[in-house]
Amino acid sequence: MIAQKYRAYLKLEKGLSANSVEAYLMDYQRLARYCEAHEIDVVHATFDDLQAFVFDISKEIISVRTLARLIAGIHSFYRFLLYHNYIEQDPSELIETPKKELHLPDVLSTEEIDRMIAQIDMSKSESHRNRAIIEMLYGSGLRVSELVNLQLSNIYLQEGYMRITGKGSKQRLVPISPVAIEWFAYWLQDRNALDIKPEATDIAFVNRYGRQLTRAMIVTIIKRLAEAAGI
């Protein structure tokens, strides 16, 4: 059993105290429960899976220190798997502890947006999705939380607008630019080829496993493009 082997690794190979071993095992068990609930193989979880887990847990954990310790536990588990050849690559390698509330710049110049768009690798399967995300975030002025929960049934491409539910459950109609319509249509073709999970049937933006993108995932996408663009 993987948990028993992990315990032995922590105790015998890492030489950790009994309390530290139990703390790391509790972190593993928390991750394992999340993976089981979302039909994910904990051993072969992806970066997206782990990022979603951290985002989910961060809603319950207020202390950055506590969250940092949990993430350290995740790193430890996947280093163990890598060391013992259960996996070929550590999916937790890029998971970072948020130092402050996740935030995206409210205002970007047209030039900056163009520079971000130029960083999208169009050979990747997620390229159309990521382009559509940028166009809707900055072209239509959506909040990340609004984009996360955007439903297909509230998008009217032919009419050129979408119905957005914002803070306090208030709804508003938001125009969609012709460019955003074009890229979202491309993304829809890609999305239709995915195995969409039942809970994400009406969700506009999903990952390659057909699961709803989280706020953390979208922030990560945008931040990586912004960093690559030197913003």
Predicted segments with their positions:
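Conserved catalytic core of the tyrosine transesterase superfamily
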Residues: M1-I231
